[in-house]
Amino acid sequence: VDRLEITRRRAAGHQAPFSHAAATIVAAILAMPAASFAHHGLGRFDRSQPVEITGTITRIDFVNPHSYLYVDVADANGETRAMRCEMRAATLLRRSGWSEEMFVIGAEAQIFGFAHRDDPNACYLEDIKIGDTLQINRNDQLEQRTTSELRNRPLRLASGELNISGDWAQEQYVIAVAPDGRGNLVPKSMIAAVESGEIALEDVPPAGWGPRPVTLTARGQSEADAFRMWSPEDNPRLRCQPTSILFDWVFDGAVNRITQKGDRIVINYGLYSFERVIHLNMDAHPEDIEPSYAGHSIGRWEGDVLVVDTIGFAPGVIAPPVRHSGELHIVERFSLNPETMELRRDYVATDPVYFEGEYVGYDIVLPSDVPYVAHPCNELAPEFISEDASRE
């Protein structure tokens, strides 16, 4: 870590005292909207209970959906207590230049974070200082990553189709603190402008990690109200299962891969390493579709826009807490801006069982700053572990 040039977003070239940094982060996180906590993993942790611990690193699990650092801490009685502190997903850490090698077994670690609501031996890691290295925040960019070679390749395939193959990811969203003390998730490129007040939090584009505005049916509203966000039974991602082809595309900054293979397009979702196939040689869906998470997709090119029609879904969750039935129908339109290399996806979903109207949204991904990796999902939080809560 000490060989890396760390770009600090709060004060360039100055390391704030540990207590001052703690106070700043606590104030900002307390001011964040509740939805941001739900998406950012703080629901199981008490943001009103900051903790500061010093211990010896014993293990690091670099996995999705969350990585975990394990430390041995001496308590007030001199007894050794084993603790685990939750960090970001391995995919996000690697995108930020972090590595497993940073966490040297046997090294001393000073950690600032938040206490777990139920487990006294768990914490949410917000800042860390390992040995004599610099103190870093969980969202800090340790290396300036360059985007993949997607920007320097032919715009079209030999067939004439637009070339959208490659590894794609949403710009990283991290916590920024506005001058008035409010905090929220913002694109990494906007951190400085938000923290200086040049850009208001209200003008920041949403991450798209939650449900889109939609009028629900009586059944849809009732089931959304009863949805338990932190229950593996209700929330698929807590049991290492995909949520939906819409939600999983950008949630948590996953790196996805698109591969054009003539009569089909294969999409590998990086969040939980699931594959989806778009059939280009079919005018209609078959009648005997086996319902699944991804459904059955057929695509066609309208000029340079890829239009994808998908049906055949198994009942599930389109975006927590909104559920969908087997009648869900999604139409996506993928378009590429060759100047900015932004791959935009506009989508419209209908489901007469759960939606009164249309479920409409869009998202944007860019050439990824790290390659796609088929990370296994390994949910290590004890409260989520069940018979099928991890998938290798």
Please tell me what each predicted stretch does:
Residues 1-19:
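N-terminal secretory signal peptides that target proteins for export/translocation
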Residues 2, 33, 191-192:
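Position-driven detector of the extreme protein N-terminus
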Residues 10-11, 28-29, 98:
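Intrinsically disordered and other compositionally biased segments
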Residues 19-34:
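Bacterial N-terminal signal peptides
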Residues 36-38:
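Boundary at the C-terminal end of the N-terminal hydrophobic targeting segment
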Residues 43-68, 72-392:
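PEST-like low-complexity, intrinsically disordered acidic/proline/serine-rich tracts
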